[in-house]
From Swiss-Prot:
The lineage of its organism: Eukaryota, Viridiplantae, Streptophyta, Embryophyta, Tracheophyta. GO terms for biological process: UDP-rhamnose biosynthetic process. Pathway: Carbohydrate biosynthesis. It catalyses: UDP-alpha-D-glucose = UDP-4-dehydro-6-deoxy-alpha-D-glucose + H2O. This is Trifunctional UDP-glucose 4,6-dehydratase/UDP-4-keto-6-deoxy-D-glucose 3,5-epimerase/UDP-4-keto-L-rhamnose-reductase RHM3. InterPro entries: dTDP_Gluc_deHydtase (IPR005888), NAD(P)-bd_dom (IPR016040), NAD(P)-bd_dom_sf (IPR036291), RmlD-like-bd (IPR029903). Its EC number is 4.2.1.76, 1.1.1.-, 5.1.3.-. It comes from Arabidopsis thaliana (Mouse-ear cress). PANTHER family: DTDP-D-GLUCOSE 4,6-DEHYDRATASE-RELATED.
C-alpha cells in the first residue's frame, strides 16, 4: 500500500477538542509538513488548545469561518494547500434540537463551501471528512456485530442528520468531480481540553466541586469511548494510509454504560457513588446505543493503546490541574442545560428564570410573542413562496377561486430576517413553500450550479421551516419523489411502491441529492407537511414545465412506467390537507403508474392524431443528458386513505388533462 505524503495541510475547527490533538500531533511529528489551522473560535473552541504548536515554524493559525468562500479560496491558493482535514462542525446533540438551523449552516453549508473551493482550485490531493458514528443511528441492544462502513445511514437527530447530509455532499464531489475524499466516522472521544458539555469532563468537574453527578434515565445507555491521543493517531494513519473514496470507522468494541462511567469517576475521586449519583429525567432523544465495527482501520495498522483506567486517570489529572481552562462553565454543568451556547450568542429555550450551578447569579430570558399560534381560531390566510414558479402561481389562482386570502412572500428563503418580516406583516395561518431550484430547462442545470442549488433547496427550505416552527405555523412543503429508483425490493412493474417511511435510494442527480438531504432533515420538524411531487402534469399543455409538454417535444422518449402528479386534482387536495392540519411525509402522486408511451398514445388520440415519436433505452438516454433521471413507483395508500375520492393516474389524466383539451 502506497503511503501518502502531504505538504501543506489545512485543518478546520482546529481549536476544538479532537482537531487540536490532531494538529498538535502532526506539528510535533512532521516538521516538514506545513500545518495551517482555521477556526472561528466559538464557545467550544479555545486557542489554548493549540499552545503546544504556537512556537513551531511549521504552524499557522487563521481565525475565520469555513462558510466564508472568499477566505477559504484565499487560504487554499496562498498557502498552497494540498490536503484538508475537515473537523469543523457543531457537534452537541442537545443543542441541535434547540437550534437545528445553526447545525445545517455549519455542518452542511460550511462543508459545501469547502468542497466547492477544492473543486475550483483543483489542487487538493486529499480531503478527509470527519463524521460521526451517529449517522448510523441507534444500534439494537442485542446486536453482537457493530456497524461496518457500508451500513445504511439512519440518523435519529438533527445533528447526525446534518453530518449524514454533509457526507452525501462529500461523496457527490468525489464522484462528480474526482475529488480524492476519505470519510471517517468516530465514536465518543475523551481526554484533556474537551469542553464540559460532554459527559466525562462534565462529571469530572462536578465531582471536583462536590456536586451530584446527574444520570439521565436509568443510566443504561451504552457508549464506546476512545482516548484522544489514540484518536489523533488514528487520523495520522488515515492521512498517510487511507484509501481514496473509502470510509473508516474510528472506534472500539469496548462499551460502557453511563452509570458505569459515573461509578468509575466517583471512585477516582474517592466518592461513594450511591451518595453522589443523582437520577434525573431522561432526554427524549437519548439513543440507547451506538456500536461500530473497528476492523477496517486496524488493517491499516492502527490499534487502541490507552486502556480505560489509564485514559480516565490522565483526563482527571488534567482537569484538576487546569480547572479554569474554559472559564465559567456553570451553565453547561446543569443536569438539563437550558442554555444553547451557539456561536455569536447564547440561546435559551424558553421564558424563565435560571440559576447558575452555584446558585448565586440569576438571569431572565424572555421569548418574544409568536406571530402565529396553532391553537387559535383565526380564519385562513396563506403565505405562499414561489410566486414566479409554476406551482406557486397555480396555488394563488386556486386561493382566488376558493376565496381564501393569500399573499406571496417577498423574502428570499435563505434570508431569515426577510422571512420573519413576511410573517409579521402578513400574519398567515399557513405557509406554502412552492419555491425551489429545479433547473432550466431541466435538472441538468443543477449539476453546474451546485452552490445555488443547495442555498435554495437545502439552506433556504430549512430556514423557512425553522422560522415557521418558531411562529407555530404549519409549512406545506412541495418536495419531490424523484429521490427513488426501481430496485430489487421495488422492481419495475411489480406494483410495489416506495412508502413514505422509505429512505431515498437515488443519488444520480445533484438536484435529487439536495432534495433527499433536506427531506431527511425536515423529518425533525413537527410543523412540516412534505408533499412528494413527481413529474407534475396539468391541463395547460403549453406550459414548458408540464411533463406531457416536455416529452411531446423530445426527439426520443424512454418508455418506462412512473408515478406522477396531476396538479389539477392534487393541488386542491394540498389546500384541504392544510385545513386538516396534516403533517409528516406524503407521497403526493395519483395512485398507480403510467408509462411514457401510454401518455403519448393518449396525447395522439386526444390532441394530435398525426403525432409520432420514437423510443430509446436508458443507456442511450444517458449519452444526451448530464445527470441520470429518477424512475419509480410511489405507494399511494396513505394519501388514498385520507382522500378516497382521488382518481388513479390514468383516470385523472383523462378527466383533468386530455378530455378538457380534446380536439374535435
Amino acid at each position: 500500500m502506497a503511503t501518502y505524503k502531504p505538504k501543506n495541510i489545512l485543518i478546520t475547527g482546529a481549536a476544538g477538542f479532537i482537531a487540536s490533538h490532531v494538529a498538535n500531533r502532526l506539528v510535533r511529528s512532521y516538521p516538514d509538513y506545513k500545518i495551517v489551522v482555521l477556526d472561528k473560535l466559538d464557545y467550544c473552541s479555545n486557542l489554548k488548545n493549540l499552545n503546544p504548536s504556537k512556537s513551531s515554524p511549521n504552524f499557522k493559525f487563521v481565525k475565520g469561518d469555513i462558510a466564508s468562500a472568499d477566505l477559504v479560496n484565499y487560504l487554499l491558493i496562498t498557502e498552497e494547500i494540498d490536503t484538508i482535514m475537515h473537523f469543523a462542525a457543531q457537534t452537541h446533540v442537545d443543542n441541535s434540537f434547540g437550534n437545528s438551523f445553526e447545525f445545517t449552516k455549519n455542518n452542511i453549508y460550511g462543508t459545501h463551501v469547502l468542497l466547492e473551493a477544492c473543486k475550483v482550485t483543483g489542487q487538493i490531493r486529499r480531503f478527509i471528512h470527519v463524521s460521526t458514528d451517529e449517522v448510523y443511528g441507534e444500534t439494537d441492544e442485542d446486536a453482537s456485530v457493530g456497524n461496518h462502513e457500508a451500513s445504511q445511514l439512519l440518523p435519529t437527530n438533527p445533528y447526525s442528520a446534518t453530518k449524514a447530509g454533509a457526507e452525501m455532499l462529500v461523496m457527490a464531489y468525489g464522484r462528480s468531480y474526482g475529488l480524492p475524499v476519505i470519510t471517517t466516522r468516530g465514536n465518543n472521544v475523551y481526554g484533556p481540553n474537551q469542553f464540559p458539555e460532554k459527559l466525562i469532563p462534565k462529571f469530572i468537574l462536578l465531582a471536583m466541586n462536590g456536586k451530584p453527578l446527574p444520570i439521565h434515565g436509568d443510566g443504561s445507555n451504552v457508549r464506546s469511548y476512545l482516548y484522544c491521543e489514540d484518536v489523533a493517531e488514528a487520523f495520522e494513519v488515515v492521512l498517510h494510509k487511507g484509501e481514496v473514496n473509502h470510509v473508516y470507522n474510528i472506534g472500539t468494541t469496548r462499551e460502557r454504560r453511563v452509570i458505569d462511567v459515573a461509578n468509575d469517576i466517583s471512585k477516582l475521586f474517592g466518592i461513594d457513588p450511591d451518595s453522589t449519583i443523582q437520577y434525573v429525567e431522561n432526554r427524549p432523544f437519548n439513543d440507547q446505543r451506538y456500536f461500530l465495527d473497528d476492523q477496517k482501520l486496524k488493517k491499516l495498522g492502527w490499534c487502541e493503546r490507552t486502556n480505560w483506567e489509564e485514559g480516565l486517570r490522565k483526563t482527571m489529572e488534567w482537569y484538576t490541574e487546569n480547572p479554569e481552562w474554559w472559564g465559567d462553565v456553570s451553565g453547561a454543568l446543569l443536569p438539563h442545560p437550558r442554555m444553547l451556547m451557539m456561536p455569536g450568542d447564547r440561546h435559551s429555550d424558553g421564558s424563565d428564570e435560571h440559576k447558575n450551578a452555584d446558585g448565586n447569579q440569576t438571569f431572565t430570558v424572555v421569548t418574544p410573542t409568536k406571530a402565529g399560534c396553532s391553537g387559535d381560531k383565526r380564519s385562513l390566510k396563506f403565505l405562499i413562496y414561489g410566486k414566479t414558479g409554476w406551482l406557486g402561481g397555480l396555488l394563488g389562482k386556486l386561493c382566488e377561486k376558493q376565496g381564501i386570502p393569500y399573499e406571496y412572500g417577498k423574502g428570499r428563503l435563505e434570508d431569515r430576517a426577510s422571512l420573519i418580516a413576511d410573517i409579521r406583516s402578513i400574519k398567515p395561518s399557513h405557509v406554502f413553500n412552492a419555491a425551489g431550484l429545479t433547473g432550466r430547462p431541466n435538472v441538468d442545470w443543477c449539476e453546474s450550479h451546485k452552490t445555488e442549488t443547495i442555498r435554495v433547496n437545502v439552506a433556504g427550505t430549512l430556514t423557512l421551516a425553522d422560522v415557521c416552527r418558531e411562529n407555530d405555523l404549519l409549512m406545506m412543503n412541495f418536495a419531490t419523489g424523484c429521490i427513488f429508483e426501481y430496485d430489487a425490493a421495488h422492481p419495475e412493474g411489480s406494483g410495489i411502491g416506495f412508502k413514505e417511511e422509505d429512505k431515498p435510494n437515488f443519488t444520480g442527480s445533484f438536484y435529487s441529492k439536495t432534495k433527499a438531504m433536506v427531506e431527511e432533515l425536515l423529518r425533525e420538524f413537527d410543523n412540516v407537511c412534505t408533499l412528494r411531487v413527481r413529474m407534475p402534469i396539468s391541463s395547460d399543455l403549453n406550459n414548458p414545465r408540464n411533463f406531457i409538454t416536455k416529452i411531446s417535444r423530445y426527439n426520443k422518449v424512454v418508455n418506462i412506467p412512473n408515478s406522477m402528479t396531476i396538479l389539477d386534482e392534487l393541488l386542491p387536495i394540498s389546500i384541504e390537507m392544510a385545513k386538516r392540519n396534516l403533517r409528516g411525509i406524503w407521497n403526493f402522486t395519483n395512485p398507480g403508474v403510467v408509462s411514457h408511451n401510454e401518455i403519448l398514445e393518449m396525447y395522439k388520440s386526444y390532441i394530435e392524431p398525426d403525432f409520432k415519436w420514437s423510443n430509446f433505452n436508458l443507456e442511450e438516454q444517458a449519452k444526451v443528458i448530464v445527470a441520470p433521471r429518477s424512475n419509480n413507483e410511489m405507494d399511494g395508500a396513505k394519501l388514498s386513505k385520507e382522500f378516497p375520492e382521488m382518481l388513479s393516474i390514468k383516470d385523472s389524466l383523462i378527466k383533468y388533462v386530455f378530455e378538457p383539451n380534446k380536439r374535435t
